[in-house]
Every structure is written in structure tokens, then in C-alpha cells.
Regions:
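Conserved catalytic-core surface of thiol
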Residues: 294-365
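Active-site nucleophile-adjacent alpha helix/oxyanion-hole segment immediately C-terminal to the catalytic cysteine
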Residues: 1-235, 302-305, 312-315, 322, ...
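Catalytic nucleophile-His microenvironment captured as a short glycine-rich beta-strand/loop
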Residues: 75, 275-309
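Flexible loop/turn segments at secondary-structure boundaries
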Residues: 33, 243-248, 254-255, 295-296, ...
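Long, positively charged binding patches that form subdomain-scale interaction surfaces
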Residues: 210-283
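Alpha-helix initiation/capping motif
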Residues: 21, 165, 201, 242, ...
Length: 365
């Protein structure tokens, strides 16, 4: 999500380079997810531990992945800051131990809340979140409430230095309504196309809204992606990145590995069957930035900007064949202006609510 906004800001203000602080967003992301978990535990405290929703909550108390809806809710609530205003820390770049500690503490808190009287839970939850906040400060630092930033021109010459709050910085340099200006589309052949789906707890902020997914044939999704790229607008894109990935070359191609010949067997499941059996699903979010079209305007290859560093893949990017796109692309977030009216009209439907453990739900890393 931040990479999409970064590209817009660099282009709009002709900046030599720019990065938002992922650490700042991560701080509030983890704090809000902690609140989401604790409140969900309070809401389900009358259900037995064996209840599938309760079980799922304790299995997934927190994670550092997520969806575009989480990014949009967080940014609209807390704003953004430049990377220099809240730099990365060791823990923000190596989140495993921090996430483990937070998960352990949240599970402990969850059990405590389930054993309390209902009238006591709200006050105790605030105390618990204070402890979570302290852990986050130790790991990630204190989020700035005000900072100075110097805007430079394309040659690196200072233009102006001003003070901002995270919200005023976002309002001035981005200013979009992220919660209403974008549409999430998905390709899930295991479900009916033309329908809108919602997944329980598919958000990062308790008082936010679950994201709505419009399920579409892959060709309709490609049409919107191509229109956006032609207008120089990058998109949030998610896929099953581990399948047929050549990390060294930075390619995603179903021809990268020939497992059938190697093991003398066949792998016959199609995309629908892989989703149904949990063999494939959306696992990683990147930024879709380019497409290679043939003479007839049909896509041959696609390029995404990844978050694994410039030394990973092809200059920090991955290139996928169109065949791989068909098989392992799952979600795309598109600005409304690139979405045909007949697809926008689908949002008027009553969405189908899916449980949190549905095969299509996986917090994207």
C-alpha cells in the first residue's frame, strides 16, 4: 500500500526519491490489531473455547501481514510520516521475535478476559493495550506527533522546510480518501463470479470495515490493470508468490520447475481445486507497475515491485508470465476511475459473509 502512495508522491512532486516510514505504520498496525483481537475475544467470551471462531482467534492473535483495507484504515486514522521521521529499527526489520512476544501476551490477555465479568472487561482491555503499547515502543520507538521535513526538487535542491503532523502531511501530499476511492477485485474460481464477498475480521482496525471483494473472471481484472498501468498508476497486487518462483532471476513462470518429469507423476488440480484444498491462496502483496503487451494488445508479461530489497529478484522486482498471472494472481486494488460501471454496480449487492478461516483469507506479508 505505501509503495503505491510513494510512486504517486514522487511523480506528483517530481522528487528525486522518497520513502514513507513503514515503521510508523507498523506501530499503529500492531496496536490496532491487538485491540481487534482483544475486543473480538470480549465479543465471543460466551462461546466455548472449542468454538471455531474462538479457536481461530487464539490461533491468529496478531501478525505483521494484512490487506489493503488495513492500510487504508490506518492511514486515514493516523496519517503517514517520511522514513526519516521514524526510521526502521532492528525489530521492525526482523519482526519474528516481536510478533511471538505480542502473540504470547495477547493469548494470555485473551484467557484473562474470558474469565472476567462483562462489566470489568472494557477497563481491563485499556490496561492491556497500555502494556502492548509499551512493548511496541521498546521494539519500534515512539511514533512522532510532529516533525520537520524538507522537500527537494528532482536535482536534490531544498525547496522548503516545514513542520507537519502525520495527518497534515498526508492531507497535503496525498489527500486521497483511501477508504472510498479504491475497489478490491479478486479471482477465485471456486466461487460465483459477479458476486461481492466479505470476510469476517478482514480488517486491522476494530471500528473499521471489512474489505469488500468483487469476484471477477481473470480477463476483466486484466482490463482494469492494463488501463491503470497505461495511465502510470501502480496498484496493490497480491498473489501466491512462492509458486514456481526463481528468486535469483526474479521470475514467476509455471515453466520454471518441471516437477512432473522430475517425480514421474502429474499434478492435475486447477486453480479452483487448489483454492478449495488450501493448496494455493493469496500469500504476498506487492505493487503492480508494468505490463508487456503484444501487437494485439494482449499481455505477455507483468512486473511487480517487491519488498524484499533491491538485491532480490530483478533489481528488486519480479517478472511474471501471463500464464502464471492466470494461475496464481488473486487480488488487485484499483482506483475507481479505472473500474467499468457494470463492475462498480456490483457493489450495490448485499455481500456474502465468509468466515475468517475461509481458504481465501490469509494476511498478506
Amino acid at each position: 500500500g505505501l509503495n503505491v502512495l510513494r510512486a504517486k508522491m514522487i511523480d506528483k512532486y517530481d522528487l528525486p526519491s522518497f520513502e514513507f516510514s513503514q515503521n510508523y505504520c507498523s506501530f499503529y498496525d500492531l496496536l490496532e490489531k491487538s485491540n481487534l483481537f482483544l475486543q473480538a475475544i470480549i465479543d465471543t467470551r460466551d462461546k466455548p473455547m472449542e468454538d471455531r471462531t474462538v479457536t481461530w482467534l487464539f490461533q491468529h492473535p496478531i501478525g505483521d501481514g494484512g490487506q489493503f483495507t488495513g492500510v487504508s484504515n490506518l492511514i486515514m486514522k493516523y496519517g503517514v510520516v517520511p522514513k526519516a521521521a521514524m526510521p526502521e529499527t532492528y525489530q521492525s526489520n526482523n519482526t519474528g521475535q516481536m510478533t511471538m512476544i505480542l502473540s504470547l501476551k495477547l493469548r494470555e490477555f485473551g484467557l484473562e478476559l474470558r474469565g472476567m465479568k462483562a462489566s470489568q472487561t472494557a477497563e481491563r482491555k485499556v490496561e492491556m493495550l497500555t502494556e502492548i503499547y509499551r512493548i511496541l515502543v521498546e521494539c519500534l520507538g515512539v511514533p512522532p506527533t510532529e516533525f520537520e521535513w524538507t522537500r527537494c526538487d528532482k536535482d536534490g535542491n531544498p525547496v522548503e522546510t516545514r513542520s507537519y503532523t502525520p495527518k497534515s502531511f498526508y492531507d497535503e501530499y496525498i489527500g486521497e480518501d483511501l477508504e472510498h476511492n479504491y475497489v478490491m477485485v479478486m479471482n477465485d474460481p471456486s466461487r460465483e463470479y459477479g458476486k461481492v464477498y466479505e470476510i469476517e475480521y478482514d480488517r486491522h482496525v476494530y471500528d473499521g470495515e471489512n474489505w469488500l471483494y468483487i469476484n471477477l473472471p481473470i480477463e476483466r481484472i486484466k482490463e482494469m490493470a492494463i488501463a491503470s498501468i497505461k495511465d502510470n498508476t501502480a496498484m496493490y497486487f497480491s498473489c501466491d508468490v512462492g509458486k514456481f518462483l526463481d528468486r535469483t532471476k526474479g521470475t514467476l513462470d509455471v515453466a520454471n520447475m518441471d516437477y512432473a518429469s522430475l517425480f514421474g507423476t502429474s499434478f492435475t488440480m486447477d486453480k479452483r481445486q487448489r483454492v478449495q484444498t488450501y493448496a494455493s491462496g493469496s500469500s504476498h502483496a506487492m505493487t503492480l507497475i508494468a505490463v508487456d503487451l503484444d501487437e494485439a494488445g494482449a499481455p505477455r508479461k507483468w512486473m511487480v515491485e517487491n519488498s524484499w530489497g533491491a538485491s532480490s529478484g530483478y533489481q528488486g522486482c519480479l517478472i511474471m508470465t501471463d500464464e502464471w498471472f492466470n494461475e496464481y494472481m488473486f487480488r488487485l486494488v484499483v482506483e475507481r476511475k479505472y473500474v467499468p460501471q457494470d463492475i462498480l454496480d456490483m457493489l450495490n449487492q448485499e455481500p456474502v459473509m465468509l468466515p475468517a478461516w475461509d481458504p481465501m483469507f490469509a494476511p498478506e506479508e
